From Swiss-Prot:
Entry GO MF terms: glycerol channel activity; water channel activity
Residue ranges annotated as motif NPA 2: 477-479
Catalysis: reaction(s): H2O(in) = H2O(out); glycerol(in) = glycerol(out)
NPA 1, short sequence motif: residues: 351-353
Name the UniProt record assigns to this protein: Probable aquaglyceroporin-4
Species this chain originates from: Gibberella zeae (strain ATCC MYA-4620 / CBS 123657 / FGSC 9075 / NRRL 31084 / PH-1)
Amino acid sequence: MAGTQDQSQDYFSKPTTPSTPGQAHLGNVANRIPSTIPDRESGTERAKSTHSRHRVLHGLPSTFMSYMSRRPVASSRGFSRVSSEGTASRPTAPQHSSHFHHYAPAEDGYYQENPWFGEADKKPIFSLGKPLPHKVRRKVLKPVRPDGKVDEEMAIVKEETTNEPHPGYASRTTSGQPYRVETQSSLPSRDIQRQQSRTTAAGVAHNDRRNDAGQPVFEYIPGEATPTPGHRDPASRVQSKQDNGHSPPDFKVDGEPLGHQEKPCVESGDTNANEMRNWWARLRARHPEPLAEFLATAVAIFLGLTGTLSVNLSATQSQPYGTYETSCWAWGFAWMFGIYLGGGVSGAHMNPAISVSLSIFRGFPWRQCVIYVFVQFIASIVAGALAYAMYADSINHVDPDMTKMSMTFFSTPREWVTLKSAFFNQVVGSAIMMIAVFALGDDQNNPPGAGMHALVLGFLVTTLKFTLGYNIGSALNPASDFGPRVIAYAVGFRGDNVFHSGWWFYGPWAATLIGSLLGCTLYDGFVFVGSESPVNFRVDKRVKKLFN
């Protein structure tokens, strides 16, 4: 036997050339073979011999095999090896390469000092730098178990169906198979007592056997009772599901809308993650999203403003420092840098219209949305103040009366453009912006490759500035318009176009939000198929009664 294994190992390590075209794909097939197969009778997992796997792979080049040996196993990438029925199933390939991070090499001891490093995100990030996450937003009914507790696993989605089934049945949210939902009111008291007395910690009770006193007779079995999957009580199913790792640990930090999820060993107290952290590192680790959103928004608006100031301040010189197209490119690249800067932490929305639209149409938490909008406005004010401080001398030299350079800081319709035309211009531009944002974030459509979302969105901003910026300046971001407008008013710009005309509200605010919601509705109505969008919601009976 040992000689056979040695021969197999020697032959396996020899560099050979694939003899057929299909042999080059055998590595991917063998990599998806489960390493464990569950035993249906005992419910345990038995190891599968890797000898057959080696036999499938022999004949491949040694360089390819060394690459295959360094690849992470499927389970580390979120693959499911066992189906819900307990049978072995083929793992599914990852949907997008941008879902996985490529970390730089780390020295020995770095992971001990930084136990949070390399952990996968436990919370969905609504990022503009990758496809948007999918959330279940429908109401959930939680049936009551016979002992009066809520059965979390048996929770069903509340849906109004045209062909209503039997009142005691509903459809599973995972497998689509019907099952019986039993509540306290639907179970007779005798059935409740029978279910409660059916199983104990040390044995299994017969259903109908009773002694002279009418008490159930138990047949005790040494060790713990191992009921079959069909007769397992809901509590044991939930516990087993948690033990198998299908649900994250129930730590307090997981219930907070903002915060960083540490490793389980850190959350349980086995490892002190703050041992090497100062007070600021502890604060940042607990609330990274607002800080990242602030930095990304401030940098993007600052770069865009300074690019526009460079062009407008040099417009009267013999050699202008660029043209209007230069300003458009500056805003596009600035937005791209902002997404690269904070897209992996906060999502880098940098726009209140985007945050509100994601909350309405994709389930972005409203509490986070309020915090994001507040942070975005603070960042825009800081960016406007910093941009003015950089160019204060040039502004006072070119425009000592503080009248002409105001259009550099905020959106202003031209004198001959009517209010209706300016409002319509803003609505159309915002709608196109959100259609493109949702299209890039839809993994069921045609998302770009890894790391390309930021570049495409930067081109989008540049294109919108090119095409819709002549009439009003194309202020598609309430934050990037309001913050610099406040700074312009504070430093001495007192023209009617600052706050007196009212455009600051019904243009960058009202028109942008209306256009964004319109664009989201159009995309979800024509393209998006996910159930998280309210466009795809079923109308509740209470809403129907209002129109009947």
